[in-house]
């Protein structure tokens, strides 16, 4: 497995997100209840960065059309989104946050 360091834990507070690059792939990194999760960075419905969306109750709302995704599973929760997000494995070692390379899947 190819793990890529993308951030330090202190960079994100709970219910915050940021876009990171993992070997040229845009990935949205989320912190929920002191756990880290990663999905593809773009909404599956339209060209919008999910890291700019509203994060609440383990879901992210697309900033463009308000479609919602479950951050933990990538599941599309409501219209207009119908296609699930791809999720990425995340691990934390001390303060360092790693995401598995999308190419490693």
At which residue positions do the language-model features occur?
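Short amphipathic
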Residues: 2-8
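Rieske [2Fe-2S] iron-sulfur-binding domain
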Residues: 11-105
């Amino acid at each position: 497995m190819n793990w890529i360091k993308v951030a330090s834990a202190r960079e994100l507070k709970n219910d915050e997100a940021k876009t990171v690059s993992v070997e040229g792939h845009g990935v949205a990194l989320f912190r929920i209840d002191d756990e880290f999760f990663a999905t593809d960075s773009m909404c599956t419905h339209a060209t919008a960065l999910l890291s700019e969306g509203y994060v609440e109750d383990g879901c992210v709302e697309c900033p463009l059309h308000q479609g919602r995704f479950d951050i933990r599973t990538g599941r599309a929760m409501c219209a207009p989104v119908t296609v699930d997000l791809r999720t990425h494995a995340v691990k934390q070692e001390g303060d360092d946050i790693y995401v598995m390379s999308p190419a490693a899947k």
